[in-house]
Curated annotation (Swiss-Prot):
It is found in: Plastid, Chloroplast thylakoid membrane. Its main location: plastid. GO terms for cellular component: chloroplast thylakoid membrane; photosystem II; photosystem II reaction center. InterPro entries: PSII_PsbJ, PSII_PsbJ_sf. One of the components of the core complex of photosystem II (PSII). PSII is a light-driven water:plastoquinone oxidoreductase that uses light energy to abstract electrons from H(2)O, generating O(2) and a proton gradient subsequently used for ATP formation. It consists of a core antenna complex that captures photons, and an electron transfer chain that converts photonic excitation into a charge separation. The lineage of its organism: Eukaryota, Viridiplantae, Streptophyta, Embryophyta, Bryophyta. GO terms for biological process: photosynthesis. PSII is composed of 1 copy each of membrane proteins PsbA, PsbB, PsbC, PsbD, PsbE, PsbF, PsbH, PsbI, PsbJ, PsbK, PsbL, PsbM, PsbT, PsbX, PsbY, PsbZ, Psb30/Ycf12, at least 3 peripheral proteins of the oxygen-evolving complex and a large number of cofactors. It forms dimeric complexes. It is a single-pass membrane protein. This is Photosystem II reaction center protein J. Disulfide bonds: none annotated. The chain crosses the membrane at residues 8-28. Belongs to the PsbJ family. Keywords: Chloroplast, Membrane, Photosynthesis, Photosystem II, Plastid, Reaction center, Thylakoid, Transmembrane, Transmembrane helix.
Amino acid sequence: MANTTGRIPLWLIGTVAGILVLGLLGIFFYGSYSGLGSSL
């Protein structure tokens, strides 16, 4: 896991991507339940 070739670590990309996906899903579910996400 110490092979740093100047690129962004995969675990960091996975963590950020997971947080973004969970955030988007939360926004979509909240919008659909509150009636604001029908246009999305």
